[in-house]
Amino acid sequence: MIFPIFFTFFLLLSTSHASVQDFCVADYKAPDGPAGYSCKKPAIVTVNDFVYSGLGIAGNTTNIFKAAVTPAFAAQFPGVNGLGISLARLDLGPGGVVPFHTHPGASEVLLVVQGTIIAGFVASDNTPYLKTLKKGDIIVFPQGLLHFQVNGGDTPAIAFPSFSSPSPGLQIVDFALFKNDLATELIAQTTLLDAPQIKKLKGVLGGTN
């Protein structure tokens, strides 16, 4: 029962782009630009362009964050190109976490379908909003705001995030700071973290300098 309610809610909230065409299926043979993919010629569009089956498979959570995201964005699901919507699957193993991150191009609605997830975001005035979510609960993350998810139980958790863009974008704060070649001294000055801790995080996440 929860899935019909969720998808009806999702479709009502989403905003599609007005167009003289019924759809703009992504043409992966053409370059991807700021406005998205070019449209495939309608004559070669098939029903398979509007169907994606990848979200029924659990993601691999054997990583440092014990988390996996399986996207159904325009890059994977050509039928959502130009429609202002997309979907993904989130798997969190016990102790799993999606660290603070932001989607510059979209708001997000997260539906929990298994387990317990602690989820929240931080507003631009630095006020935190967080809640422990159970099966059937949803939370919205406004566009561009930092947010996170943590498995709040001792069993695997599954959620389906939906987005108000076919290409929501992603920036993870930990990666932005520590998975690059930005000098440790600069990071220490701008974050007040100790240099040894910064070097440790760079080592874990693959950064240098």
From Swiss-Prot:
Compartments, as annotated in UniProt: Secreted, Extracellular space, Apoplast; Secreted, Cell wall
The organism's place on the tree of life at top rank: Eukaryota
Annotated Gene3D superfamilies: Jelly Rolls (2.60.120.10)
SMART domains: Cupin_1
SUPFAM superfamilies: RmlC-like cupins
Segment forming the signal sequence: 1-18
GO cellular component labels: apoplast
Molecular-function GO terms, alphabetical: manganese ion binding
Organism: Prunus persica (Peach)
One record GO biological process: auxin-activated signaling pathway
Residues reported in the UniProt entry to bind Mn(2+): 101, 103, 108, 147
Keywords: Apoplast, Auxin signaling pathway, Cell wall, Disulfide bond, Glycoprotein, Manganese, Metal-binding, Receptor, Secreted, Signal
Subunit structure: Interacts with ABP20.
Residues with attached carbohydrate: 60
Family that this chain belongs to: Belongs to the germin family.
Disulfide bonds: 24-39
Family annotation (CDD domains): cupin_OxOx
Domain Cupin type-1: 53-199
Lineage of origin: Eukaryota, Viridiplantae, Streptophyta, Embryophyta, Tracheophyta
Record's function text: Probable receptor for the plant growth-promoting hormone auxin.
Entry protein name: Auxin-binding protein ABP19b
